[in-house]
A protein has these predicted regions:
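Acidic, surface-exposed loops and disordered segments
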Residues: 6, 18-211
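Bacterial N-terminal signal peptides
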Residues: 8-15
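Bacterial N-terminal signal peptides that target proteins for export
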Residues: 1-8
Length: 211
């Protein structure tokens, strides 16, 4: 009887070992079904959108994901303004076309925000050195959360530079009411995608593990 019990325990142990996964196997299995990794790896910058603005409830979720990004000493040194008024976007675009008339010849050009119907304007605190980094982390959270809900996006620096340098466009920037010492750093265009861009190659050689 003792021998039988010993054999039973031994067989059970072998079966359990056979059913258990190695750390490598667990990692591979988790990666295959990890929605975060899937979102990161499938996200693409979108430049063609359907005309309707992103639902404000959806944008609220996107912004909440943004402000939950990691940031230096929890200063939350960012401010965000969301614009989905087509008239405002068109007026800014008209000003942009005055300075860049050749853009009007592009049949795919609809507005200066890469054709997006909803735009997030993100400003950084110029008195805090880490604020631009924090704004970048916030922007990435917004972009990824948007993609996970079927919302395309494109991160933009050009419109921010234009709005700060063009006196007429700067009036719209002032109307956004950013706090003192806050400077428009970047914009993100959001919208329902009307294209499915292909992935572009990435240079993995730029990453090296150090011994």
């Amino acid at each position: 009887m003792k021998t039988f019990k010993f054999l039973l325990v031994a067989v059970s142990a072998v079966l359990l070992m056979g059913c258990s996964k190695t750390p490598q196997q667990e990692t591979k299995a988790d990666d295959d079904k990890n929605v975060v990794i899937e979102t990161i790896m499938t996200r693409r910058s979108v430049r063609k959108y359907q005309p309707q603005a992103v639902n404000r409830d959806t944008m609220q979720t996107i912004v909440e994901c943004g402000i939950n990004a990691p940031n230096a000493i929890n200063r939350q040194a960012w401010e965000v303004r969301i614009v989905d008024n087509p008239e405002v976007i068109q007026k800014l675009t008209d000003l942009y076309l005055k300075d860049n008339p050749k853009e009007a010849e592009n049949p795919n050009f609809k507005n200066m925000f890469r054709n997006a119907p909803t735009v997030a304007f993100i400003a950084n605190d110029t008195t805090f050195a880490y604020s631009p980094v924090d704004c970048g982390l916030m922007a990435e959270n917004m972009i990824l959360s948007a993609w996970s809900m079927g919302i395309g996006s494109c991160c933009l620096g050009g419109p921010a530079r234009f709005m700060k340098s063009n006196p007429e466009a700067n009036k719209y920037l002032l109307e956004m009411g950013f706090s003192e010492n806050y400077d428009l750093l970047l914009c993100i265009g959001f919208g329902y995608p009307a294209e499915t861009p292909k992935a572009k190659p990435r240079d993995a050689a730029k990453v090296k593990f150090m011994d």
